C-alpha cells in the first residue's frame, strides 16, 4: 500500500519539475528522493540543492545516492540556506505528519527552510502520504515533541578539539535541548502532494475525514 501511495505522489509531483529548475530539499525524504530520481529518468535537466543539519546529517545519505545515479547536486548546511535560496526555483520537502490545521510536522529545521523560501517567494511543495495525515491540531513544536539525546549536540563527531561542552551534565544551571521535530505553519506551504492528488493545506481536513472513512470500510 505504501509503495502505491508513493508511486501516485511521484506521478503528480514530477509534473512540477521543469527544465533548468534548481530544486532544494532538506535532510532525506523517501518520497522526495523517488520524485527526483524519476524526474532524472525522464530526462529532465535540473539541479538539486540538499540542505542538511547536525547532528544526524541525513542529507549526506541522500546526496550519496543521488550522485551515484548521476544527478547534479549541491550540498550545504542549514546556516547557509538564506544565501542559496536565491538560486532555487522550488522547494520539495517530506513530512512525518500533516495535522488537520495544515501544520506540517517534520524533522527539526524544516520550518526554518520553509520560512526562508516563503520570504524569498519560492514555492514550497510538501510530499506526504495520506496515512500520515492526522486529525490532531498543533500550533507549535513545544506543546508536543520528541527529545533526542542531548549528548548528540554537545560535540562534533571526529573533532576532539571541539570540547567546550564536556561535562555539561554536571552544570546545574545548563540544559541541552535536542528537539527531533518542528511544526511548519500552513502559511509556508504552497501545495501538498499526496496520493489523493495535489491539494492546498486548507484541504487537509477533507482528506483526514475521507481517509478515515476508507479505513472504516476496509
What are these regions (language model features)?
Residues 2-18:
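A short, well-structured juxtamembrane/interface segment
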Residues 17-21, 42-47:
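Short, surface-exposed connector motifs at secondary-structure boundaries
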Residues 22-33, 55:
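Gly/Ser/Thr-rich loops at beta-strand to alpha-helix junctions
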Residues 34, 39-45, 51-218:
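Conserved phosphate- and dinucleotide-binding cores of soluble alpha/beta proteins
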Amino acid at each position: 500500500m505504501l509503495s502505491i501511495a508513493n508511486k501516485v505522489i511521484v506521478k503528480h509531483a514530477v509534473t512540477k519539475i521543469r527544465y533548468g529548475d534548481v530544486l532544494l530539499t532538506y535532510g532525506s525524504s523517501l518520497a522526495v528522493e523517488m520524485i527526483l530520481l524519476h524526474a532524472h529518468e525522464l530526462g529532465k535537466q535540473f539541479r538539486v540543492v540538499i540542505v542538511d543539519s547536525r547532528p544526524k546529517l541525513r542529507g549526506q545519505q541522500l546526496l550519496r545516492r543521488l550522485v551515484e545515479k548521476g544527478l547534479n547536486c549541491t550540498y550545504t548546511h542549514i546556516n547557509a540556506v538564506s544565501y542559496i535560496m536565491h538560486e532555487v526555483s522550488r522547494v520539495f520537502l517530506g513530512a512525518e505528519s500533516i495535522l488537520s490545521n495544515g501544520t506540517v510536522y517534520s524533522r527539526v529545521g524544516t520550518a526554518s527552510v520553509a520560512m526562508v523560501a516563503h520570504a524569498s517567494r519560492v514555492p514550497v511543495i510538501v510530499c506526504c502520504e495520506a496515512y500520515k495525515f492526522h486529525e490532531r491540531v498543533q500550533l507549535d513544536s513545544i506543546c508536543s515533541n520528541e527529545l533526542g539525546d542531548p549528548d548528540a549536540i554537545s560535540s562534533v563527531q571526529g573533532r576532539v578539539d571541539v570540547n567546550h561542552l564536556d561535562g555539561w551534565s554536571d552544570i546545574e544551571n545548563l540544559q541541552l535541548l535536542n528537539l527531533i521535530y518542528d511544526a511548519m505553519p500552513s502559511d509556508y506551504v504552497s501545495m501538498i502532494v499526496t496520493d489523493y492528488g495535489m491539494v492546498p493545506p486548507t484541504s487537509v481536513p477533507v482528506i483526514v475525514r475521507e481517509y478515515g472513512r476508507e479505513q472504516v470500510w476496509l
